[in-house]
Amino acid sequence: MKLRVGAALFGLGVLLLVFAAGLPFYVAPSVTKLPYDLEPTTSVAEAKNAKFLKITRVGESVSIEVLQGDLVSSVEVIPQPDDTRDRLPEELKGDAVIWDVYQTVRRSDTSDVVSQYSTELALDRISGAAAPWKEQWLNESGAEQTPVGNVSYSGQIYKFPFGTDKRAYQVFDRDLKRAVPAKFVGTEKIKGIEAYRFEQRIENEVLNTPEASLKPLLGRFAPGATSGQIVYSNTRTLWIDPVTGSYVNVREQQNKELRPDTGTATVLLDADFNYNDDTVTRSVDTVKDNRFKIGLISFWGPIAAGVLGLIALVVGVWLVTRTNDGAARHRADPAVAPGTDPTRTRVDQEPVRDAETAEQPRTEPAGGPLTDEIPPASTNWKSEDPTVPTQRAAHGEVEQR
């Protein structure tokens, strides 16, 4: 029985050691990739006392004005597992996922829509950067039809790589339609999570504004101007979880100015957007959960399996060798003859007697020791011992002393 148990434990130990070695190399990489069935997420940022451009169209009339108030921006990310399976080209299958993203900026007091956009893009499952997919698109005007391939995404957009490094990354800016470096500036604790802080500075960049969009603005704010441009600045601060590459917190200090060729500039946007507390809390909770899964499979799982495997291996070997030693000793013992006492003692040792069964010393009679042996019959022996009676003389003989 011990031999079987030992062999089973030995085999279990080997399996656990193989499992421990395979976890970080074969299983862990699967959890450090964007999943196909990722749940939709929504992040909310708020800007207090912001200045913003509001264009209202009622029939053929258009109202253009700069207002001031609180703004709320919500970004919803919806993964598309079916499109990922069916629409990606062969060179991207297995390595990228398709996401649909929608952003809406509203006034806090009236819920009126200030701006909105929608987009569809492909992201690399490991790096989180935009994948070179020809069918990506971006709709900023709210048009019903959007030309496919009207935007070329590059760099990080909604996620950083798994295992983010302390270095600069290219981060895509939707207003510029290109990626700009975001520099690593340090680490910070956010609700118990150590996050990497990156800053991207965009200063006085001239936006590519269609003439049809620029003319109404010049007519409203600079009637005497014949041309102008919109100048854009943004300081974007990103707090990234280095393990998963997820956004923990985001801040964007945006500014847009209309600068006509004559007249004064007009501020079209001056807003400081920050993730609200609920979004930060949910981001931290998600990061903690994903960190636990990654750590369990890539670190703690292999350690636990390795330790248990070694224990099972050692115990199994010990049981097998102990059983073999016992069998060897059993074979070395001399056989006991049938009918003999296996517990007999050596002749040079005192026998061990039980107190109750030990033989008691005999009391010899006064006449001498008794014996069961009968002396041989003789008529010519006599003893010098006076206590032994002499043999009576035969008839006609003289008794001799």
Describe each region flagged by the PLM.
Residues H330-R401:
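Acidic/Ser-Thr/Pro-Gly-rich, low-complexity N-terminal segments
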Residues K2-G163, D277-S298, L319-G326:
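Extracellular or lumenal secretory-pathway regions
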Residues G245, G316-V320, R401:
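Primarily hydrophobic membrane-targeting regions of prokaryotic envelope proteins
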Residues L218-A305, A312:
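Membrane-proximal extracellular "stem/stalk" segments
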Residues N49, R201-E205, N255:
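Solvent-exposed coil/turn segments that connect beta secondary-structure elements
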Residues G155-N249:
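Membrane-proximal low-complexity regions enriched in glycine and acidic/polar residues
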Residues R106-D112, N204-K215, E257-T264:
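Short, cysteine-centered beta-strand-loop-beta hairpins and adjacent loop/turn segments enriched
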Residues K2-A8, F292-V347:
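Juxtamembrane interface at the cytosolic side of transmembrane helices
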